[in-house]
């Protein structure tokens, strides 16, 4: 289950808020490692570190790091301050954080009786890589709005893993990150997706929320065995809180796997079977035979949801202006334009709901 190694830090490669990327010498040679200073302290060159190297052994893409579990000879100081929410519960790295709605929080009163997000558009996506593309579509038509990212716990648990999130926060493309469930490290911590959406609205003052898992999609190639099934649950959560769910389809023209070409089977299952509340499903007006195939596939969702066709003019240019690199499953903007345009179209539609 876990491959353990002891190593020595030989260099710091780069860092961003909440994370440090390192080169570590182990018995087999050097490996790339990632440390989260809020959990283990900041490793320095020469430090001995304990590593979990399972991801390296598996050859994972997004998560292909050795993970620093401890800096045993230089432990960080004990944390101070309030906080009673335990996340990554009953694991060796379980962490205590301050929940937005717990009694020690300054936001407790605002959230104690909160039961609605007041019609806020909630864009739901399967993959983390859709987040910046959705933002490109939102800001192309509605610059200056406040957008919160509500992170589910189906992928990476620490929000710090996402370099995109760090950059989007620094560029003010996000007014904040809300980490829900077992995920942690956001500007605001929440127990459930429901309290996360309420916090996005009433704590961060978001005009729009984008809900997606963190980096590192999990899937088995079966109908039900993928972490993105939670996107259907997010539609239900948004609806029960009087939000306006906007479903972003996962569409690809560049994926070599047939089940993900056109409208991914992930979207058809999550929105067609799991989402019990109606949503507005955004279908981009893509040209040619591929666009026609996408529209035909998406039509299967019309029995429960409203299909909204959105023009895509100008979205390619908007995507080129993204402050972060666009990549999904190793494919960039030009390698799978349909994927990113589809996500941006969902953002464009959400922006139209604000007027």
Regions found by a protein language model. Name each.
Residues 4, 37-44, 125-129, 133, ...:
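Conserved active-site and cofactor/substrate-binding residues in soluble primary-metabolism enzymes
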Residues 177-197, 202-203, 209-310, 315-317, ...:
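A structural signal for small-residue-enriched, beta-sheet-centric alpha/beta enzyme cores
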Residues 31-34, 47-49, 120-122, 145-149, ...:
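Structural motif
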Residues 60-61, 144-145, 245-250, 256, ...:
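Flexible, glycine/charged-enriched surface loops at secondary-structure junctions
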Residues 95-190:
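Phosphate-binding glycine-rich loops and their immediate beta-loop-alpha structural context
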Residues 1-119, 133, 142-146:
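Extended, charged alpha/beta regions that create polyanion-binding interfaces
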Residues 5-13, 155-162, 170-182, 319, ...:
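A cross-family phosphate/adenosyl-ligand binding-site feature
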Residues 48-53, 305-355:
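Extended hydrophobic packing segments that form well-structured cores
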């Amino acid at each position: 289950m876990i491959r353990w190694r002891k190593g020595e830090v030989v260099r710091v490669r780069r860092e961003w808020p909440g994370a440090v990327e390192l080169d570590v010498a182990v018995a087999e040679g050097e490996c790339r490692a990632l440390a989260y200073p809020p959990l283990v302290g900041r490793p320095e060159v020469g430090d001995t570190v304990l590593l979990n190297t399972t991801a390296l052994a598996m050859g994972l893409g997004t998560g292909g790091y050795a993970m620093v579990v401890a800096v045993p000879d230089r432990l960080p100081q004990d944390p101070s301050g309030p906080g009673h929410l335990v996340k990554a519960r009953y694991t060796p790295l379980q962490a205590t954080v301050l929940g937005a709605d717990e009694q020690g929080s300054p936001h407790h009163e605002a959230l104690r009786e909160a039961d609605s997000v007041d019609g806020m558009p909630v864009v739901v996506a399967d993959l983390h890589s859709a987040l910046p593309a959705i933002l490109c579509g939102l800001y192309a038509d509605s610059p200056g709005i406040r957008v919160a990212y509500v992170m589910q716990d189906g992928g990476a648990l620490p929000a710090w893993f996402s370099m995109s999130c760090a950059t989007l926060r620094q560029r003010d493309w996000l007014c904040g990150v809300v980490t829900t469930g077992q995920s942690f490290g956001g500007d605001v911590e929440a127990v459930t997706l429901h309290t996360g959406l309420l916090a996005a609205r009433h704590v961060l003052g978001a005009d729009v929320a984008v809900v997606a898992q963190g980096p590192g999609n999990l899937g088995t190639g079966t109908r039900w065995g993928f972490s993105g099934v939670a996107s259907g649950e997010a539609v239900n959560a948004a609806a029960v809180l009087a939000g306006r769910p906007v479903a972003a389809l996962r569409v690809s023209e560049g994926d070599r796997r047939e089940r993900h070409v056109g409208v991914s089977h992930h979207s058809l299952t999550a929105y067609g079977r799991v989402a019990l509340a109606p949503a507005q499903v955004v279908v981009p007006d893509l040209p040619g035979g591929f666009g026609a195939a996408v529209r035909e596939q998406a039509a299967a969702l019309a029995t429960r949801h409203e299909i909204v066709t959105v023009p895509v003019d100008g979205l390619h240019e908007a995507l080129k202006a993204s402050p972060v690199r666009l990549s999904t499953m190793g494919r960039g903007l030009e390698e799978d334009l349909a994927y990113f345009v589809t996500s941006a179209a969902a953002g464009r539609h959400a922006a139209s709901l604000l007027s």
